[in-house]
Amino acid sequence: MADLKKLAEEIVGLTLLEAQELKTILKDEYGIEPAAGGAVMMAGPADGAGGAAEEQTEFDVVLKNAGASKINVIKEVRGITGLGLKEAKDLVEAGGKIKEGVDKAEAEEIKGKLEAAGAEVELA
């Protein structure tokens, strides 16, 4: 049981790039495909009193598809994240979070740059 807890702590502590590499390894070597949606859903309030929804202040910029101009998207990802060429290429090919926890203005700016380069992007 302690080994499972240690493994869970290591997985939670992965960087974005390490998580992308883990996804690729699980897919290529073990044939494990990521679940649709890829997120764990939390249960809502049991009493039905949701109250007023709070406005989201932090956003994650998620690359859904690099599109036909993958080279342009890689260049933009490098500029946005500061990653090296190989790391940016791996991130673009795997898809996923480009930036986490950014304010709405920055998230919209990044989304605009990536979409101008030909990528399909969503804010979460």
Swiss-Prot record:
Biological processes annotated in GO: translation
CDD domains (alphabetical): Ribosomal_L7_L12
GO MF term (any one): structural constituent of ribosome
Superkingdom, natural source: Bacteria
Pfam families assigned: Ribosomal_L12, Ribosomal_L12_N
GO CC annotation, single: cytosolic large ribosomal subunit
Protein keywords: Ribonucleoprotein, Ribosomal protein
Family as reported in the entry's similarity comment: Belongs to the bacterial ribosomal protein bL12 family.
Assembly description: Homodimer. Part of the ribosomal stalk of the 50S ribosomal subunit. Forms a multimeric L10(L12)X complex, where L10 forms an elongated spine to which 2 to 4 L12 dimers bind in a sequential fashion. Binds GTP-bound translation factors.
Record NCBIfam families: L12 (TIGR00855)
Job description of the protein: Forms part of the ribosomal stalk which helps the ribosome interact with GTP-bound translation factors. Is thus essential for accurate translation.
Protein name: Large ribosomal subunit protein bL12
Species this chain originates from: Jannaschia sp. (strain CCS1)
Gene this chain is encoded by: rplL
